[in-house]
Amino acid sequence: MPTINQLIAQPREVQKSRKKVPALQQSPQKRGVCTRVYTTTPKKPNSALRKVAKVRLTNGFEVIGYIPGEGHNLQEHSVVMIRGGRVKDLPGVRYHILRGVLDTQGVKNRKQRRSKYGAKRPK
C-alpha cells in the first residue's frame, strides 16, 4: 500500500480498457481483400469445418473473418466488407464478413433472417 506522499509523487495509472475490435478503428465496417480462404476446426466440445478468410484491410491490418451461412463464392483477391463480432469457438476470429456486399454473394434459398445473409426476397 503506497503512502500519500508516494501517490502525490506518482499518481495511480488509469487502466485502459482493451478494444474488442481494434482493426476497425472506431468504424462500423471496413473493406479488405482476401489473402487466403480456408476452413478450420472449432474448440473442444464442437466439431465442424468452419469457413474463414484472412483479410488485408484498407488500413493495413490483417485479420481473420468468419464467412457465415451455407456455401460461399469467396476466393483469393475477393474484395469483402467486414464487421465486428467474434466466433466463440474459433480462437482468433474476431470479425464477420458481410454477405451480399461487394464480391460476397448472399446465401441462396434463404427464407428467414435474410437481411443477415444478404438474400433477396423470394418471389
From Swiss-Prot:
What keywords tag this UniProt record? Methylation, Ribonucleoprotein, Ribosomal protein, RNA-binding, rRNA-binding, tRNA-binding
What is an annotated GO biological process for this record, any one? translation
Question: Is rRNA-binding one of the keywords UniProt gives this record?
Answer: yes
| InterPro entries assigned | NA-bd_OB-fold, Ribosomal_uS12, Ribosomal_uS12_bac
**CDD domains assigned to the protein according to its UniProt record, in alphabetical order:** Ribosomal_S12 (cd03368)
GO MF term (any one): tRNA binding
Instruction: State the GO CC annotations.
Output: ribosome; small ribosomal subunit
Q: Which SUPFAM superfamilies match?
A: Nucleic acid-binding proteins (SSF50249)
Cited Pfam families: Ribosom_S12_S23 (PF00164)
Q: Point out residues bearing the modification 3-methylthioaspartic acid.
A: D89
Q: Which segments of the protein form a coiled coil according to its record?
A: none
Q: How does it assemble?
A: Part of the 30S ribosomal subunit. Contacts proteins S8 and S17. May interact with IF1 in the 30S initiation complex.
| NCBIfam families attached to this UniProt entry | rpsL_bact
Regarding protein family, the annotation reads:
Belongs to the universal ribosomal protein uS12 family.
> What function does the entry list?
With S4 and S5 plays an important role in translational accuracy. Interacts with and stabilizes bases of the 16S rRNA that are involved in tRNA selection in the A site and with the mRNA backbone. Located at the interface of the 30S and 50S subunits, it traverses the body of the 30S subunit contacting proteins on the other side and probably holding the rRNA structure together. The combined cluster of proteins S8, S12 and S17 appears to hold together the shoulder and platform of the 30S subunit.
Q: What is the protein name given in its UniProt record?
A: Small ribosomal subunit protein uS12
Instruction: Please report the organism this UniProt entry assigns to the protein.
Output: Bradyrhizobium diazoefficiens (strain JCM 10833 / BCRC 13528 / IAM 13628 / NBRC 14792 / USDA 110)
Gene giving rise to this polypeptide: rpsL
